[in-house]
Design a protein with these regions (language model features):
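Glycine-rich FAD pyrophosphate-binding loop
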Residues: 21-41
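Active-site-adjacent segment of FAD-dependent monooxygenases/related oxidoreductases
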Residues: 38-109, 205-206
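Core beta-strand elements of the Rossmann-like FAD/NAD(P) dinucleotide-binding domain
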Residues: 139-147
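Beta1/beta-strand and adjacent pyrophosphate-binding region of the FAD-binding site
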Residues: 1-12
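Conserved mid-domain beta->alpha element of the FAD-binding
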Residues: 11-18, 106, 150, 240-313
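C-terminal helical "tail/cap" subdomain of flavin- and related membrane-associated enzymes
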Residues: 285-351
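Conserved FAD-binding catalytic core of PHBH/FMO-like flavoproteins
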Residues: 108, 147, 151-242
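A conserved short coil-to-beta-strand element within the FAD-binding core of flavoproteins
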Residues: 119-133
Length: 351
C-alpha cells in the first residue's frame, strides 16, 4: 500500500489527504496547531474546486452551505464604474464560504475514510532515503512513508528543510482587514470594490449571510470604506503584507510542495486557496497512478500563470489617475456585452 505523510492541515493539506485516502493510500496528516482553525483567510471557492472536491463528498457540502456571488461592482466614491455578473452559468458560479467552514467539511470527509488530523505535531526535521522519507516531530516521534507532501504554508518548514529557495519579493505597504456582521449592508451577494484617491482601494466581500470582509490598503479597513456601513459586530481585525513568491522547484525526490508552501501572491482574484486545492488533487492522483514526474513542471507553470494574473489585477486596482480612469471606462463599455462578460469572468475564475 502506498504510504504518504502530509504536513499541514489547511485546505491544501486536507485536500491531499482526503483524495489520497479516497484513492486507497495509507495517509497521515499532521498539523502544528492544537486544533482546527476558527479563522478564515480565504473566502471564494471556484467551480473547479467544488468539482475537484465532489468525489470525496466535500464539494456538495461546501456548495450547499456557501453563498453564491451574483456579481462584482467597482465604484469611484458611490458611483459604479464597472459591473460584472458572476452567475450567468455554472462555469462562473463563484461561491463564498469562510475558510474554517471549508476546512470543516474537508475534515468531515477525511473522517469518513478513517483518517484524523494529528494536531500538536510540529515538523522538526526530514530524512530522505532511497525508498522512504522520515518526518521527525520533536526528539522521539519519527514517521516513515514513501512520499511526503509539504502543505505547511508560506513559511513552510518542509521547504526550508529541503533548502528550496522561495523566489520573489514583498510588496510595499500594509493591508488591513475587518470581518464584520452587518444586517443592513445592501450588497448581500456582490463583491463591492471602491477606488480611493492616490491609487488606494477598499473591497467588501460577502462571507456568509450578513457577514462581510472589508479589506483595504490602509491602516484601518473600516475607516477606509468610503460609504456608510452599519456594523453590528466586529468578529476580528488585523493587518497583513503581501508577498509575491514561488518556490524554485515543487519537488525534491519523494517530497513535494503544494499550496502556499509553493506559491504566494496578492488576494486579488481569490485564487490562492483554489490553486492549492488544485495542486493537492493533482498530486494525489499522480502519486496513485505513478506520474509524479510531471507534477513539478505542470503545477509550477500553473502557479506562475496565477501569479501573473493576480499581479495584473492588483496593479490595475492600484493604478493612479488618468490611466485608471481610462482603463475602467474601457472595461465598463466592453463589459456590457455577454461574450465580453463571459471572457472576463472566465479569466478571473479559471484554474
Amino acid at each position: 500500500m502506498t504510504t504518504v505523510t502530509v504536513i499541514g492541515a489547511g485546505p491544501t493539506g486536507l485536500t491531499a489527504a482526503v483524495e489520497l485516502a479516497r484513492l486507497g493510500a495509507k495517509v497521515r496528516i499532521f498539523e502544528k496547531r492544537d486544533g482546527a482553525s476558527n479563522l478564515s483567510r480565504a473566502v471564494g471557492i471556484t467551480p473547479g474546486s467544488i468539482e475537484l472536491l465532489t468525489p470525496c463528498g466535500a464539494g456538495p457540502a461546501i456548495e450547499a452551505e456557501a453563498i453564491r456571488f451574483e456579481g462584482l461592482t467597482v465604484h469611484r466614491g458611490d458611483h459604479p464604474v464597472l459591473s460584472l455578473p458572476l452567475n450567468f452559468d455554472a462555469r462562473s458560479s463563484l461561491h463564498g464560504l469562510p475558510q474554517d467552514r471549508t476546512e470543516a467539511h474537508l475534515i468531515d470527509a477525511l473522517a469518513r475514510y478513517g483518517v484524523q488530523v494529528e494536531y500538536n505535531r510540529e515538523l522538526t526535521n526530514l530524512h530522505i532515503e532511497a525508498d522512504r522519507v522520515t518526518a521527525c516531530f520533536g526528539r522521539h516521534i519519527e514517521v516513515p512513508s514513501k512520499y511526503l507532501i509539504g502543505a505547511d504554508g508560506a513559511h513552510s518548514r518542509v521547504r526550508s528543510t529541503l533548502g528550496i529557495h522561495f523566489l520573489g519579493h514583498d510588496l510595499p505597504g500594509r493591508w488591513s482587514i475587518a470581518d464584520v456582521h452587518s444586517a443592513s449592508w445592501p450588497h448581500k451577494t456582490r463583491f463591492s470594490g471602491y477606488l480611493l484617491p492616490k491609487g488606494h482601494v477598499c473591497v467588501v466581500v460577502p462571507m456568509a449571510p450578513d457577514r462581510y470582509r472589508v479589506i483595504a490598503d490602509a491602516d484601518d479597513a473600516l475607516k477606509a470604506l468610503p460609504v456608510p456601513m452599519e456594523v453590528d459586530q466586529v468578529h476580528r481585525t488585523g493587518s497583513f503584507t503581501i508577498q509575491v513568491r514561488q518556490a524554485e522547484q515543487y519537488r525534491k525526490g519523494a517530497v513535494f510542495l503544494a499550496g502556499d508552501a509553493a506559491h504566494v501572491h496578492s488576494p486579488v482574484g481569490g485564487r490562492g486557496m483554489n490553486l492549492g486545492i488544485a495542486d493537492a488533487a493533482d498530486l494525489a492522483r499522480r502519486i496513485m497512478d505513478g506520474t509524479t514526474q510531471g507534477y513539478d513542471e505542470a503545477r509550477y507553470a500553473e502557479g506562475e500563470h496565477v501569479i501573473q494574473i493576480s499581479e495584473r489585477g492588483r496593479r490595475m486596482l492600484q493604478s493612479k489617475g488618468a490611466a485608471k480612469r481610462a482603463l475602467f471606462a474601457t472595461m465598463s463599455v466592453i463589459s456590457h456585452t455577454p461574450p465580453a462578460q463571459r471572457a472576463i469572468v472566465h479569466q478571473l475564475l479559471s484554474g
